[in-house]
Each structure stands twice: as structure tokens, then as C-alpha cells.
Amino acid sequence: MCTSIRHDWQLPEVLELFNIPFNDLILNAHLIHRKFFNSNEIQIAGLLNIKTGGCPENCKYCSQSAHYKTQLKKEDLLNIETIKEAIKKAKVNGIDRFCFAAAWRQIRDRDIEYICNIISLIKSENLESCASLGMVTLEQAKKLKTAGLDFYNHNIDTSRDFYYNVTTTRSYDDRLSSLNNISEAEINICSGGILGLGESIEDRAKMLLTLANLKKHPKSVPINRLVPIKGTPFENNPKISNIDFIRTIAVARILMPESYVRLAAGRESMSHEMQALCLFAGANSLFYGEKLLTTPNADCNDDKNLLSKLGVKTKQAVFFDS
């Protein structure tokens, strides 16, 4: 199994990985994981929604879209003091990366000062900072970099071929353009996707291929399991199997050996045994807290119990050089 860092993967190679017998696949992924990381150490990230609901995008999985009638209550931007308290609480809980998100299509110039203030608060607690605020221009990204932003999250969600089954209000190229702006501004990329949208195995392969063939691999690759939201077009989507989810984690690890592969949304429905297999297959990051944006997350005490049983330690914040 190749352990070099590559940016020239071909689709047949990735599909072949998905077809490897399960035990062989996760073993190979685990060995690659051990070469690049301490396999008994995990990164813990926290996530705060600073603006909830009313998003103009029509992503068919999202409770925050203004296009669908969900039970979500729209909320305006949080005030800085509330955010400051959330950051301090995250620090006490052992989180080493603090992420904040807003239900925006894109960053507006008028909000840059507010965003930079949040970044400064995060950095003052000696935490890694990550923002997920929609599309971003190069000029805006440079301002965030100057403010000290370590990461910017902008998921591609799925493959280019399947993308328009998920959203039509922004293009796949829009997403890739933002990723390019983030990279040019020398901010580390956080980008992944969602499993269970109705995509095929080939779509999963193409999604990971797109990420693995970027000029720089994303430093973080969140893999989400669809949490069906009542009122959205995907509320009745069938659940992706545990085996298929773990396979995708393993392939992500093989394609992007140096990236943090994060268990993101949908983890609250996973047993300890499944999460342990995900960690064995190469996942080494997870979100900690009661909810992720608007969806439930695994119980904090349950997470502590899981990591204790597995003998897995949490890592301290590392500030990457771009």
C-alpha cells in the first residue's frame, strides 16, 4: 500500500480501494495512520453557531435553509460576550480547536471586523481557530489570515456529478473557488463531505478524489453522516450502512495520510464499537459538545467514557505553518 503523499490519484485507483475486502482496507488505513500520527491520540474540536437559520442556500439536507419549513427558530448574530463565554467553556472542556459557523451564503465585508474580533478571542485562549462562513473572496481570506485564523471550513459535500441533486443555489466551482482563495491566503483548508445524501459509491470516491488532488491536501477532512431533518427534502433518506461509512473513513485516510479525518455530524447515532472502528480505520478528530450547529451530537460524558475505554488521549493544539 502506497504511503507517499500524492496529488495525482485516478478514479479507478480510488474505486479499487473501495472494493478491497473490509479487513484488508481498514488494516492498510490503520498502518498508514500510524506512520503519520500517534494512533492513540485524537484531536477535539468545538463548534459554535454564531448565526442560526435563514440561509438563502437550498441545500436539501439543511435545517437552516430558508427554503424549507423546519422546526428551527431563526436567530440573529450572537453578541461578542456570549461568544467569549463559549470559547472559555470550550477551553475548560479540553477542546483544542474552536470552530464558529454562520448560516450565510457568503461573508459580507461589513461583518469582517466582527469575525476578526471572534478570531482574536479564540487566539487569546491559545486555541486553534476555524471559521465556516460560506463563500469567501481572496481579499476577505487575507484579512482573516491577518487576524490569525488557522483554518477555514468549506465542505464540497459530494461529487461534482451528484452535486446538483443536493443544492442548486451555488455551483461546485463556487466551492472550489473559495477553497482556492483560502489556500492562496495561506489559511489551512478544512473540507469534507456528507454521506447518505443518496450518492453512489462512485460519488464518494469522486468526492475524496477531488479533495486528495487539491494542490494542498485539506489539513482537516470532516466526514458527516446525514442526520435527516424533518421538513427538508432528505428527511426520509435511507441511512448509510456502518460498514460503508467506515470504508469511506479508511479511503480518506489512505488518500490523505497527513490530514486529520474528523467524525462530524451523525456521530450521536454511532455505537462505541462503530466509533472505535472508525478510529482504527484512520479517524483522529471529533467534534465535542451537545450539538453540531442545529443537530444533536454525542453526549460529552459518553465521549469521555469512550476515549477512556479505548486508551485514547486528546492532543494539545498545534498551530500549523502554511
UniProtKB/Swiss-Prot annotation:
Provide the binding site for [4Fe-4S] cluster: 55, 59, 62
Query: PROSITE patterns from the entry?
Result: RADICAL_SAM
Give me the reactions it catalyses.
Answer: (4R,5S)-dethiobiotin + (sulfur carrier)-SH + 2 reduced [2Fe-2S]-[ferredoxin] + 2 S-adenosyl-L-methionine = (sulfur carrier)-H + biotin + 2 5'-deoxyadenosine + 2 L-methionine + 2 oxidized [2Fe-2S]-[ferredoxin]
> SUPFAM superfamilies, from UniProt?
Radical SAM enzymes (SSF102114)
Q: Which InterPro entries match?
A: Aldolase_TIM (IPR013785), BATS_dom (IPR010722), Biotin_synth/BioAB (IPR002684), Biotin_synthase (IPR024177), Elp3/MiaA/NifB-like_rSAM (IPR006638), rSAM (IPR007197)
Q: Look up the record and name the cofactor or cofactors this protein needs.
A: [4Fe-4S] cluster; [2Fe-2S] cluster
In terms of Pfam families, this protein maps to: BATS (PF06968), Radical_SAM (PF04055)
Tell me which EC number(s) this protein carries.
2.8.1.6
Name the residues that bind [2Fe-2S] cluster: 99, 130, 190, 262
GO molecular function: any one?
biotin synthase activity
Pathway stated in the Swiss-Prot or TrEMBL entry: Cofactor biosynthesis; biotin biosynthesis; biotin from 7,8-diaminononanoate: step 2/2
Q: One GO BP annotation here?
A: biotin biosynthetic process
Q: What is written in the cofactor note of this entry? A: Binds 1 [4Fe-4S] cluster. The cluster is coordinated with 3 cysteines and an exchangeable S-adenosyl-L-methionine. Binds 1 [2Fe-2S] cluster. The cluster is coordinated with 3 cysteines and 1 arginine.
Q: How does it assemble?
A: Homodimer.
Function of the molecule:
Catalyzes the conversion of dethiobiotin (DTB) to biotin by the insertion of a sulfur atom into dethiobiotin via a radical-based mechanism.
Query: What family is reported?
Result: Belongs to the radical SAM superfamily. Biotin synthase family.
Name-wise, this protein is Biotin synthase
> To which species is this protein native?
Ehrlichia ruminantium (strain Gardel)
Gene encoding this polypeptide?
A: bioB
